[in-house]
C-alpha cells in the first residue's frame, strides 16, 4: 500500500475529503493509529468514541461535538458505522441531542436532525467483538444525502417525536416509536438530568434524549451502496 498521512488541515472540497477517506479503506485501526502516532485502547468500553476521533484526525475534521457538521465548511457530517461480516450495522447511529424545551415554531427544515443528515460521509468499520480493536479494518466510504423517500421517512418520524415532546409526553416515548428515527436517553449516568415539558405543561427533570437512526435505515442505505459498487 502507498504511504498515507493524516490531512494536516481541513479538506478544501468534498472530492478531497472522499479521496482521503478512500485511501483509508483496507487499513486496520491499529495501522492508522500507529501511522498517526496515537495510542490505541485495548477495547472501546471506556473509549466509545475513539474510532471516530481517529478517523476525524485522518480526515482533518474540525467540529468535534459542536452543533455544526464535522466538516462545517463543506457541510458534511462524518459517521463511522460498526458493521458485521455481512456489512450490516451492529448498532444504531447517533445523530444529535434532542431539544426538550423551547420548541415552539420549530420545523423539520430548520431542525438539527435535518442539518446533520443533509450530507454524510459514512465510513463502515469492522465491529464484531471477536476481532481485536487494532485488527478491525476500515471499509469503503460513502458520501450520501437522503433521497426524497428517505427524507420523507425521517421527517415523518421527527415530526411525530417532536409532537410528543411538545405535548409533554417525552417520558412515554420508547425506542419503538419511529420507523427509521428513534429518541432515547443519552447520558453516561442517570444523575445528569435536563428540563423538559411535563404532561400538564409544567417543567420536569428527565434524562437528556438523543435522536438515533435505526439499524433498518442504515442497513438499507449501506446495502444499496455496496450492491451498486459490486455491479
Swiss-Prot record:
It comes from Klebsiella pneumoniae (strain 342). The keyword Transit peptide does not apply. Gene3D superfamilies: DNA mismatch repair MutH/Restriction endonuclease, type II (3.40.600.10). This is DNA mismatch repair protein MutH. GO terms for molecular function: DNA binding; endonuclease activity. InterPro entries: DNA_mismatch_repair_MutH, DNA_rep_MutH/RE_typeII_Sau3AI, DNA_rep_MutH/T2_RE_sf, Restrct_endonuc-II-like. It holds the Pfam family MutH. Sequence-specific endonuclease that cleaves unmethylated GATC sequences. It is involved in DNA mismatch repair. GO terms for cellular component: cytoplasm. Keywords: Cytoplasm, DNA damage, DNA repair, Endonuclease, Hydrolase, Nuclease. Belongs to the MutH family. GO terms for biological process: DNA modification; mismatch repair. Its main location: cytoplasm. It is found in: Cytoplasm. The gene is mutH. SMART domains: MutH (SM00927). It comes from the Bacteria.
Amino acid at each position: 500500500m502507498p504511504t498515507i498521512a493524516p490531512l494536516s488541515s481541513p479538506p478544501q472540497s468534498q472530492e478531497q475529503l472522499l479521496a482521503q477517506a478512500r485511501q483509508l479503506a483496507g487499513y486496520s485501526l491499529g495501522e492508522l493509529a500507529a501511522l498517526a502516532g496515537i495510542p490505541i485502547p485495548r477495547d472501546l468500553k471506556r473509549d466509545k468514541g475513539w474510532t471516530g476521533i481517529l478517523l476525524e484526525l485522518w480526515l482533518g475534521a474540525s467540529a468535534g461535538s459542536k452543533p455544526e457538521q464535522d466538516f462545517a465548511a463543506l457541510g458534511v457530517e462524518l459517521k463511522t458505522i460498526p458493521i458485521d461480516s455481512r456489512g450490516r450495522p451492529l448498532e444504531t447511529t447517533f445523530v444529535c441531542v434532542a431539544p426538550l424545551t423551547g420548541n415552539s415554531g420549530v420545523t423539520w427544515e430548520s431542525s438539527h436532525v435535518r442539518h446533520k443528515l443533509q450530507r454524510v460521509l459514512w465510513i463502515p468499520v469492522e465491529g464484531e467483538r471477536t476481532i481485536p480493536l487494532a485488527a478491525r479494518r476500515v471499509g469503503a466510504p460513502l458520501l450520501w444525502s437522503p433521497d426524497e423517500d428517505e427524507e420523507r421517512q425521517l421527517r415523518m418520524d421527527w415530526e411525530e417525536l417532536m409532537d410528543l415532546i411538545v405535548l409533554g409526553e417525552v417520558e412515554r416515548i420508547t425506542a419503538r416509536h419511529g420507523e427509521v428515527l428513534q429518541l432515547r436517553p443519552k447520558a453516561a449516568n442517570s444523575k445528569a438530568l435536563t428540563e423538559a415539558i411535563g404532561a400538564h405543561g409544567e417543567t420536569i427533570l428527565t434524562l437528556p434524549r438523543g435522536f438515533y437512526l435505526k439499524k433498518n435505515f442504515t442497513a438499507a442505505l449501506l446495502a444499496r451502496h455496496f450492491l451498486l459498487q459490486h455491479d
